[in-house]
Amino acid sequence: MLNSAGYFLTDQASLALSTLIIEINERKESGVYDSDDIYSNFYEDMRSAETIKAFAAKYPCLYDIIFHNADERVQLITDCLRGMIGHKDEIMETFGFDCTQTGDLSISSGDSHNGGKKVVIVKGPSGTLVYKPHALAPELLFEKVRDIVMEKGKVKYSLDTAKVLSFGDYGFQEFIRQKPVSTEEEACRYYYRIGAFSAVFNALRCDDLHYENIVCAGERPYFVDLETLVKNNSKESDTKNYPPFLRDVLSTFEDSVLGTMMYPMNSSFVFFDFDMGGISGSPKQTSKKWKSYSLCNEGTDRICITSGEGRLSEANNLLYCNGKEVLPIYFAEEMIQGYQDAMNAVIASKAQIIDAMKSSEGTIRRVLRPTAMYGKFLQVASSPLYYRDKTARVKLFSKLYKGIDQSPREFSRVSCEVEALMNNDIPFFEQKINGKDIIANHNYTISDYNTSSPSDGVEQFIGKIDEDYIRRQTMLIRMSLASSYNSKAEGEVFGRELPREKLALDSDMTRAAEMIGEQLLSSALQAKESDSISWFTESLIDNIKLDVLDVKMYDGGGTVMLFLYLWKYTGREKWLRAAENVMSGAEELGYTKPKADVSFFTGAAGLVYLWYNFFALTGDTSYVDKIDSYLKECLVKMKESPDDIRDDIIAGAAGTLVALSRMNRQLRLDVIDEILEISAEHLADRFEKGETEAMTGFAHGYAGIALAFAEYGDYTGDERYTALAAKAVDMENKYFCEEEKNWKDLRDKGGFGSFWCHGAPGIGLARLMMKKLKGFENNETISEDILRGVHILLREGFASDMDHSLCHGTFGTMDMLLTYANAIGSSELRETAVSAAGRYMNEIEKEGFKAGIKGMSATPSGMTGITGVAYTLMRLAHPEMPALNSIEIPEIRRTDSGTAEHTDSEIYAFAVS
């Protein structure tokens, strides 16, 4: 029992810790103690009855909580021992644990509920046993559902669960120890089981299988806490004030396999800024939102509490082999296969599963707010201020009333939350699996809190599961696993390669592009109240995250362009509707709001480019009005934050100058001229002062800046910008290496790039576009740089380690080859691109798609995803299409009626000697 006694003392002391530190500092500052050893004096002082009495009078709330907590802990241990003695024979038979020979009792460090109840770990000579002070009906129900699924014979390996004994409102569970695997085969079976388990939990709408609830035991995962087995969100959602499409997106995410929390949780939809996923949550992560606290200078009068970056606690959820972590990302195919097999078994067992649910008399836990939110309140409430004054403590917790609807049910619910927090407990809500009421803190029922029961929700949800749902979930599993990729992590234990999604493509390039478009449409998020669509996708900010597709040109803008030009060249109206629906989805999700960022690939100029293409292809002049009014609002924001303007092609003024100068030759809008003038002055000022970042390359470096100056100089006739363009070329060419026939990459890693974004191909492309502009038509340096770009593109543009992306992959190489071919009239370069397309289409079918951000799924991103592949295939089939990475502008011929007629993209035709 020594362990429980030690915990007992530590538990009580932790409640008073911050208050005791305040006390010792107050006495130190007031000079109460003459001795130098202030800490020892304080320690002795706090042991006297008189001091304790005064302390209790000063902090009455703390005094009450400590004694209340002590009584609860004694009762908890008593209940545990009584349960063991009362059921010793069943415990021996089920677990082989001898209750007459008990050693230590350890109370878990987890949350306290329902009068201080916590999990207790009991150790003895015969093993270890887990006491749970709540019903284990969810575990028993899951076993029933698991058995039903396994009877179909579709799941290859057993899905073992921890043994349990349930006795009403408490029970006992087998203690599972973490074990490594010894072989790759065992790891494969482990991750197959993860996939299969995730399917069953997904079908039951379980949503709390985070890293603390999984234990790796060799090739078998065990789930040690299923109290939230079935989710019920039949009550009106907290997202009721959100835009309808955003509500639909969040609901789809919650009801997906990722809603179980088993897979990596790197997403913009989750409450935390670190990954709590069941198979991936690791204490190696740090948080910017959440803090960790530790004692410093213990045993001295300088004792204090310091805060640091929040970290996850140690757990047993990560799989190891020979001391190395077996990373789940490399076992995506095993997890997907397990998920598919088990979910197909679920589909075949729907009626039996629903019967099992309907016959259950058990309860499940309802999590009505994130537990971490309650924890934050208790953390604040541990301040001496809230220990002195009960009224202040009640006022603090009453902030939970803020923002709720005014119904009696919600007031009752929050009252129960406040009551639990006042007792230093995390509020605990339960619901019968076949009931609508919720029970708060084991002692108060709120009738008809929900409009349906958890089993009703499962019945409704499981009825919708079909092959299409399974396919969508496998895509999400891939995206989620991709978000866990860490290039700095230790290599894969068994030497595996990252798995890729395979796509079958027709040999006809237009048809192949259309097949990709059809796959995108089939996986789209569909609004319930409109025709709007979007997608889940992988975004890259600091790390890969799951997000909803934006229509920035670097991301979803390419998908809009693909659909528009599929409509142009196939004549199928569904593609025009699809393009319009993506745009309406972006508007509903708030992606089309005016912004100060008027860059091309990440800002407002890209959105204008999309509307421009709608105008060019449909002749609908309302798009011009939309552009005009939108940019006027952007201009206001731009003037409010002029220092936020960046420099480069991707996200800065250079992209703005190239895109808007070209479009305004056709649109002739005053607002564009004003934006161009501000952008040009900003970029010129920074360039002349040497403040632009010293980088080579088109996307982020001198090549893009040179093109921007040249474009604006040609547009305005201002020779200042033509001269600045020439200067930028000269600065970049200082870094040309004759030996490598390439420009040095000035980023940290150094080397020589061979991509659109970095290296000779993109630099040559920028020079190619400068060649037709005023002051550079007969420039020999420009002509020579173009040839250098083509040379490296042909020599290195199809390296074996390249991905398939448009930004820095093989399809970017093909796209640039086509642009070069169009410009110089080279059938040879075009044939090289077409031939390469055939090879890489076959590679995508046989080996899988290599995304541009180490993703494993065919996401709808234009520059890094499968959309870029489809768009490039369309360009190879129809070379007159505008190149996205060259910011080509379709020319518009105005008719006498004021409408527009579209002509093919302007071709930069000239000869290079």
Can you say where each PLM-predicted feature lies in the sequence?
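Low-complexity, Ser/Thr/Pro/Gly-enriched N-terminal "stalk/linker" regions
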Residues: 482-555, 562-565, 569, 573-574, ...
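Hydrophobic residue at the +6 position relative to the catalytic HRD Asp in the kinase catalytic loop
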Residues: 212-214
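CBM-like carbohydrate-recognition segments
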Residues: 805-807, 825-913
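Conserved ATP-binding subdomain of kinase catalytic cores across diverse folds
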Residues: 5-65, 69-206, 220-222
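C-terminal catalytic region of ATP-dependent kinase domains
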Residues: 1-18, 22-26, 31-32, 38-81, ...
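Well-ordered alpha-helical scaffold segments within catalytic/enzyme domains
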Residues: 263, 497-504, 558-572, 591, ...
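Solvent-exposed loop and edge beta-strand segments that line ligand/cofactor-binding
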Residues: 539-557, 588-604, 639-653, 688-703, ...
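Long, well-ordered core segments of solenoidal/helical folds
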Residues: 513-531, 574-594, 622-643, 674-692, ...
